[in-house]
Design a protein with these regions (language model features):
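Active-site beta-loop-alpha junctions enriched in small/polar residues
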Residues: 21-23, 53, 58-62, 85-89, ...
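Active-site acidic/histidine proton-transfer and metal-coordination neighborhood
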Residues: 1-81
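Short, basic, helix/turn surface patches
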Residues: 2, 8-11, 41-48, 83-90, ...
Length: 191
């Protein structure tokens, strides 16, 4: 990860998304992982300062909102924040609105999406909540956007379609285009 700051700098990035783990593939307890991450992220803060680039840990099907908050509070630097993925907290059994209430002031980047239950997928699989265009799922995207604005977020709103719901009968490009239109409409309504 430390070498990636140089790449981000070459691109002119001011925020770099990072992923810490993935609960699906990790069998070890989270306590030791969290302690290692805190130490690694403290080192990363020094590199981030040198480059003037903040890094944003995504809730990538790995850590709960409380665990992420624990990391942020332990590292205690403006150079570390969150990439808030609107759907990934649901996939861990958490409410994204409650997660936003805890983490909103730390959001440096976003993955905006909407989800629908995929009845054909095994319930324990992450894709049992499959992506649909924004506005066609069950996530309270308008409320999450309002919470982001109220927290002072001024960064990008990146649409992410990760695993299309089988009932959506268009391709990913169509889902992204539809999502962008809806996201623009929702953002205009925040003014």
């Amino acid at each position: 990860m430390l070498d990636s700051f140089g790449h981000a700098d070459l691109l002119g990035a001011k925020v770099m998304r990072v992923v810490s783990s993935n609960r699906i593939y990790r069998g070890e307890p989270h306590g030791p992982q969290l302690e290692r991450l805190k130490a690694q992220y403290r080192q990363a803060v020094d590199v981030a300062k040198r480059y003037g680039i903040r890094f944003a840990v995504e809730n990538h099907l790995d850590y709960s909102a409380d665990e992420l908050l624990e990391i942020l509070e332990a590292v205690d630097s403006p150079y570390i924040g969150i990439t808030f993925d609107f759907g990934n907290f649901v996939r861990l059994g958490e409410d994204p609105v409650e997660a936003m209430a805890k983490l909103g002031k730390f959001v440096y980047a976003t993955h905006v999406k909407d989800l629908r239950v995929n009845e054909d997928a095994p319930q324990e699989e992450w894709y049992s909540y499959s992506a649909v265009p924004i506005g066609e799922g069950f996530l309270d995207v308008p409320r999450l956007l309002r919470m982001l604005k109220d927290a002072g977020y001024t960064g990008l709103l990146a649409v992410e379609i990760d695993c299309l719901h089988p009932a959506y009968h268009h391709d990913e490009d169509a889902a992204v285009a539809q999502s962008v239109r809806e996201l623009k409409r929702l953002v205009q309504g925040l003014s």
